[in-house]
Amino acid sequence: MVSFLSSSVSRLPLRIAGRRIPGRFAVPQVRTYAKDLKFGVDARASLLTGVDTLARAVSVTLGPKGRNVLIDQPFGSPKITKDGVTVARSVSLKDKFENLGARLVQDVASKTNEVAGDGTTTATVLTRAIFSETVRNVAAGCNPMDLRRGIQLAVDNVVEFLQANKRDITTSEEISQVATISANGDTHIGELLAKAMERVGKEGVITVKEGRTISDELEVTEGMKFDRGYISPYFITDVKSQKVEFENPLILLSEKKVSAVQDILPSLELAAQQRRPLVIIAEDVDGEALAACILNKLRGQLQVVAIKAPGFGDNRRNMLGDLAVLTDSAVFNDEIDVSIEKAQPHHLGSCGSVTVTKEDTIIMKGAGDHVKVNDRCEQIRGVMADPNLTEYEKEKLQERLAKLSGGIAVIKVGGSSEVEVNEKKDRIVDALNAVKAAVSEGVLPGAGTSFVKASLRLGDIPTNNFDQKLGVEIVRKAITRPAQTILENAGLEGNLIVGKLKELYGKEFNIGYDIAKDRFVDLNEIGVLDPLKVVRTGLVDASGVASLMGTTECAIVDAPEESKAPAGPPGMGGMGGMPGMM
């Protein structure tokens, strides 16, 4: 294994996983394809068909009585889920023009999920509602650019209205309520997340993993989180969550940039010999060193991830020191006698597990001595007592202390089958993201109620022309669709109930419809709440993409390749004086 690693590294500048890297002697090969084009009404109609198809699949999951979607998978059992972004990502349409529209909605769902962590189904419903009305108005002769300006004007007014009426959450009960709503009414998940947040605090770290028992478990362990992610997406081990997850890895820390293969070759060989993943945290990892890591990962020879060290200057040095104490490793810098290319097993640290995303890294159950970790915390507290420190320096020290001394809550999802565990895990992750969003920006009345009340504010917005007025009207109608969809999924008359809500309780912001008890109530009192961040992000993302699609005048896709006709049968030989038959 060691010699194989070494020999593979020597060929790095030439090839990575069978792909030629452009170099001094590389000759780029350009391949062209024929294109199909559609214009005007035809283009927008095809996009709308794709948007509508995907939105219908996603919208059935919205609300406490939304339905599940069954998704076939290339490997393993079919997936059962109510997670909007999972449903959206699984859709691929045969018609390429329609698939363009579906892919744009997938981008909306993915972006909303990335920013807010929840609300993807609402964003999808809003995208369809805004785009369908925009297409209808453009077909009637309206100026698409003015419609877009009107839509953006209305969205700005709605966001301003929602921010003025949001409220902060402070109690564990409110956190449980937000989580319960996001988990489709599962009070067990709500209580579990509230308990986890109570254990580690609102700024604490909570992660979700698959458990090995039938019941769910909550475990609080020592660990650290810092805001640096993987350098390259080639390191990802879980494609769905876009994460790198390792168990019992070795950890290499360096204060300097790592570029040469020789710098990390001993550490790669040590990890290969012990059959353990390797985590490299350095000022930067690039050049042949990065290529070596990627090549070994892609070939399956070694699980490895490279991460930039957190912080800058002296703060980076201190944080690497904290990581060294936590993981029982050495930091390779000018102060150590041994250079990184001569790393020995005792120079590498370890931990129970590590999770790396595009933006941050979580290290759990470091192998460092508890006494040394506590001594390091006391040392930081001693430095903080210096009266000559600036506010910035105190803030950074407090941040280091919180990372080093704070625990990490791990929710282990249990179940009797893989399908059940995955479905429940999706709901817990959504609920966790909703709770984080609620804590950061506050909450609003749920079930689409805040959008319905905001729609009543859009009647008197001044605009420059009639087409912009129609753009405002598009948003006014569209933002009532989430509430209507939630009601329709529960088997109720969505239009009728939303109309009554506007007419009877238009001026009472917190009054909404309780589906469980079939009556109008104060949603704050019964705990039906939506995070402002989720609602706001979904509306902004949906309106931006939908109004932009409305300005489309031409759509271009790859033309299908023409299949070559099979050769005809050979002619029959002549008989006697007769000619052959063809």
Swiss-Prot record:
The gene is hsp60. NCBIfam families: GroEL, PRK00013.1, PRK12849.1, PRK12850.1, PRK12851.1. Residues 570-582 have a biased composition (Gly residues). It is found in: Mitochondrion. GO terms for molecular function: ATP binding; ATP hydrolysis activity; ATP-dependent protein folding chaperone; protein folding chaperone; protein-folding chaperone binding. Keywords: ATP-binding, Chaperone, Mitochondrion, Nucleotide-binding, Phosphoprotein, Stress response, Transit peptide. May participate in assembly and/or disassembly of proteins imported into the mitochondrion. HSP60 are ATPases and have affinity for unfolded proteins. Belongs to the chaperonin (HSP60) family. The keyword ATP-binding applies. It comes from Schizosaccharomyces pombe (strain 972 / ATCC 24843) (Fission yeast). This is Heat shock protein 60, mitochondrial. GO terms for biological process: mitochondrial unfolded protein response; mitochondrion organization; protein folding; protein import into mitochondrial intermembrane space; protein import into mitochondrial matrix; protein refolding.
